[in-house]
Every structure is written in structure tokens, then in C-alpha cells.
């Protein structure tokens, strides 16, 4: 399954330095992501602070999440998924884009019936788990810059991460591992969110991000 999405917002960017990246603390969330292709029912609530909730039924594709207008390779993303109950295809994932080059990236902590795969590159150990690293290609597909051909970078946890407690994604671990495999993110950063994504499925989630 390759989930399709088209973002409707013009996004700010920031420059990325070269070399290995280290973790830094996060500023408060400032970005609310809500997109649906119009299929089925998606009821998303932009809660206070970093909280959001979404209930979906018989959907096409949607992406809902909270995070930051400008992404960072150094960010530690903290979150608590108090509810994560997909029935069918869905991801609980760090999600974002870079430009120059145009890259769509995922760090998937949990999923529904489908665990994403691709061109296998190796593994990275981070935050108490082991993630498989993949690349995939999208051809003439929707992107933050309209219809484009671009790469996707993936880190997918080998086992679903337990939910209901405070956990972290140290993104620099993934960025450095990707770079060691020749997977170089772009030099400018669009948004970065901790997202619930669903495709032809139903379910509900309630997530707080900081």
C-alpha cells in the first residue's frame, strides 16, 4: 500500500546543517495537520496544547496530526497515544517533508493490519526499539509541491510500540542512520508532525504531542 496525500498549505522552511545531528529539546507545537481525500468519515478535533483526537470510519486516505511548522533533524518528539485503535490500514508515525531534495519521511511506531516495507537498507536502534530502514519511490504523485516524483524514507519499528504512556522519538538517530545508508534528506524543512494516518479503514486515536 502506498498512501497518497496532497497538502493544501504553503509551508515555511528552514536550513539544515551538514554532519551528524544531535538531539535537542522541542518547542511547543505550532502546526495542526488535517487532510482527507474525502472518502468516508473523518472526525478530527484540534485539542488544547499538543492534543488531538480523530475518529474515522470507512475512509479513503487521511492524515491528522500535531507538530511543528518547521521540521528539524535534531528534534526529540515526545508523545502519549492514550488511544490508538485502528481497524485496517493505519500508521502512528512521525511524518514530514523536506525540500531540496523533495523527500517524504516516516518514523512508524505502530500500525494496523499493514506494516509498511520497501527497499530494505538496514536497521537503527533508537528509544528502546529496533527499526527497519526502507526507501520507496513515488512517481507523479501528490506532494507539498504539487504532482512530483520523489523518494520516501522510512524507519519502521520491528514490533508495534506499546501505547498509553509517555514515549519519545529521537529523530536525529534516524537521520544519522539514514545518512549512513546514503539517504540524504533535503536542505530545507517543511512541517513535521506526530500523525495518525489511515487508508481504507476505521478506528480512533487520541494523541498528545510535545
UniProtKB/Swiss-Prot annotation:
Spell out the catalytic residues.
104 (nucleophile), 197 (proton donor)
| Keywords on record | Carbohydrate metabolism, Glycosidase, Hydrolase, Polysaccharide degradation, Signal, Xylan degradation
The pathway to which it is assigned is: Glycan degradation; xylan degradation
Which SUPFAM superfamilies would you find in this protein's record? Concanavalin A-like lectins/glucanases (SSF49899)
Q: Under which main EC class is this enzyme filed?
A: hydrolase
What the entry lists under PROSITE patterns is as follows: GH11_1, GH11_2, GH11_3
| Source organism superkingdom | Bacteria
Q: Which reaction does it catalyse?
A: Endohydrolysis of (1->4)-beta-D-xylosidic linkages in xylans
Q: Known EC number(s)?
A: 3.2.1.8
Q: Where is the GH11 domain?
A: 20-210
Q: Which Gene3D superfamilies match?
A: 2.60.120.180
One GO BP annotation is: xylan catabolic process
MF GO annotations: endo-1,4-beta-xylanase activity
- Which Pfam families does the entry mention? Glyco_hydro_11
Keyword Plastid tagged? no
Please list which residues make up the signal peptide. 1-19
Report the sequence similarity comment from the record: Belongs to the glycosyl hydrolase 11 (cellulase G) family.
UniProt name for this protein = Endo-1,4-beta-xylanase A
Give the organism the record lists.
Geobacillus stearothermophilus (Bacillus stearothermophilus)
Lineage runs: Bacteria, Bacillati, Bacillota, Bacilli, Bacillales
**In the UniProt record, what gene is named as encoding this protein?**
xynA
